[in-house]
Amino acid sequence: MQNYKKYAIPPAQLIIADVPYNVGKNFYGSNPSWYVGGDNKNGESKLAGKAAFNSDFNFNLYEYFHFCSKMLKKEDKKPLARGRSSDSPCMIVFCSFEQLPTLIDAGKKHGFVNYIPLVFVKNYSPQVLKANMRVVGATEYALVLYRDRLPKFRNGVQIDENGKNIPNTGHMIFNWFAWERDGKDIPKIHPSQKPVRVLKQLIEIFTDEGDVVIDPCCGSGSTLRAAAELGRSAYGFEIDRNFYTRAKEEMLVFNKDGQMHITDFI
């Protein structure tokens, strides 16, 4: 991200990313992938004791927040009507439950003094090996981080000619979401890849068509695909050449009204 200025990327309305969890060699710890065929009788697989990606060992969280603060749009200072959101930007950071306090602290040190926690509920758990031992994890977590004003918020509310909310047009959005898995049309590239369906929900809530969305930890490219399919301008950074190549050749080669191509992202 350090060289982002040379690409002349416009300021983002939304930065959304899944930062490395810093679990290193324990990434597959409770996952059946640790064993051949998912059965410990078969012995350990090639994934046992392996990290999912190289950046999980040396990710600099504070440097990440520093550059994100530079890539976001400036705060919206326009006067607001009562009960309205501003057009201010925000960040969404996926994380583990244990990372929440660390991310909140890091965000405050870089001007993101406010936050909204999000929970994503799954109907399955990857912690199969712990099923007969304890309660297993079936949730994902994220933080919406913002500076001062509440960020742009789109819940379907309509405005009349007098600038007032039209009754019964907006809907309440809860701080929990169903974790909707993607179909076979979305390639599986990254071990912690987030579903395009889930990303689309978030992008629709916090941006408008034509807004800029940036993913600083791009991985599979699923954020870019979700944003592009919704008519947002998408930009991403990825240091792992293998993930970059697969995202370019598999995730981002698709048609949106016959016009979408990888060259739209570079």
Model-derived features with residue positions:
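Conserved SAM-binding loop
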Residues: 247-248
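Short acidic, low-complexity intrinsically disordered linear motifs used
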Residues: 258-266
